[in-house]
């Protein structure tokens, strides 16, 4: 009996190794996705961000926002709540940085633009991160949702934006062992 149990123990270890391999594959995928986003032009990153928010339910107006001298916003549109009762005006700002974080002056400029466009709330998207002072500034006044690089990757996966989900299969050794 002991000799029969030994292979089963080894197979269970292999199952655990398969799980860690899945985590490694996901981490590798996230790194590749972060790299692809970091290599986008600023204009492409704005298009990418609008596409993500469209999947999340924001309907952008056809009136485009100039890429240069955009007054602190990269797009605006409307979000209809799930009950179809209330529509809110949304403005977005996108910053693709390769190393610098989004700072408080960036948020303050965005808050000014939000007031100009009479926005109900704003979404500030970056592939980088936000400084603590930027996060504090975003909590004051009109609500701003901050989406940093990690949030961006999570949302791209959740809404399957420009990615193709792949199904993999693992052998369940516990059901295949000889009795």
Language-model segments: residues:
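Mixed-charge (Asp/Glu-Lys/Arg
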Residues: 1-177
């Amino acid at each position: 009996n002991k000799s029969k149990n030994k292979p089963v123990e080894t197979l269970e270890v292999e199952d655990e190794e398969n799980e860690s391999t899945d985590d490694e594959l996901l981490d590798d995928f996230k790194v590749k996705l972060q790299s692809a986003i970091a290599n986008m032009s600023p204009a492409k990153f704005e298009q990418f961000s609008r596409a993500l928010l469209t999947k999340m339910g924001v309907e952008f107006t056809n009136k485009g926002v100039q890429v240069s001298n955009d007054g602190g916003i990269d797009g605006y549109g409307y979000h209809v709540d799930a009950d179809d009762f209330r529509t809110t005006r949304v403005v977005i700002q996108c910053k693709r940085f390769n190393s610098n974080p989004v700072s408080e002056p960036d948020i303050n400029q965005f808050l000014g633009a939000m007031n100009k466009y009479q926005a109900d709330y704003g979404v500030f998207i970056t592939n980088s991160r936000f400084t603590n002072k930027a996060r504090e500034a975003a909590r004051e006044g009109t609500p701003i949702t901050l989406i940093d690089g990690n949030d961006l990757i999570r949302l791209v996966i959740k809404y399957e934006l420009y990615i193709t989900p792949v199904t993999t299969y693992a052998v369940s050794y516990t059901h295949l062992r000889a009795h």
